[in-house]
């Protein structure tokens, strides 16, 4: 059974623009990035300058304000996949981790971090996989102790996605 998503002309324009961006800013460098196991920070900044980071973020924080329209995220995933760009985790920063700040952060934290994420200045990562527990967050062994003005984090990780 074929399923069709309800794309509109705005989505088609976005797809064309994002695909052209990838062809210029990612495809020519992708093999080198994979070899080095790192996507350079400049790529995220270019994504931000082009308006492709964290599209859901409210306009008051510098975002496009496309909250609730998940089809833009679908298009980004399809365009990355279409080009075989499987080790670029830009969606992790803007679409997976940043919503935690938007939903659970204070207004001060939103004002500080969301504009930087939208611009690609700040890249968020995830480090949850541990040697003896995999990605089972219920059994995570890492600890974080509130030291007053900072947290002391102690633990061993196997992977850090978007670690730079």
Regions found by a protein language model. Name each.
Residues 11, 22, 106, 155:
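Residue-level signal for inorganic ion chemistry
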Residues 16-21, 45-50:
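N-terminal glycine-rich anion-binding loops that anchor highly charged ligand groups
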Residues 22-31:
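N-terminal capping segment at the start of a domain
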Residues 1-13:
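Intrinsic disorder at enzyme termini
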Residues 49-111, 115-120, 161-163:
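Internal helix-loop-helix
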């Amino acid at each position: 059974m074929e399923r069709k998503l309800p794309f509109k002309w705005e989505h088609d324009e976005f797809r064309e623009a994002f695909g052209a961006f990838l062809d210029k800013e990612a495809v020519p460098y992708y093999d080198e990035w994979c070899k080095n196991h790192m996507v350079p920070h400049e790529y995220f900044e270019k994504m931000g300058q082009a308006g492709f980071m964290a599209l859901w973020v409210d306009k008051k924080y510098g975002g496009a304000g496309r909250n609730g329209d998940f089809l833009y995220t679908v298009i980004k995933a399809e365009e990355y996949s279409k080009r075989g760009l499987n080790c670029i985790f830009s969606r992790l920063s803007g679409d997976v981790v940043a919503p935690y700040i938007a939903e659970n952060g204070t207004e001060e934290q939103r004002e500080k971090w969301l504009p930087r994420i939208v611009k690609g200045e700040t890249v968020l990562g995830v480090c949850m996989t541990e040697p003896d527990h995999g990605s089972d967050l219920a059994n995570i062994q890492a600890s974080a102790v509130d030291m007053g003005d900072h947290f002391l984090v102690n633990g061993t990780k196997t992977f850090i996605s978007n670690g730079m």
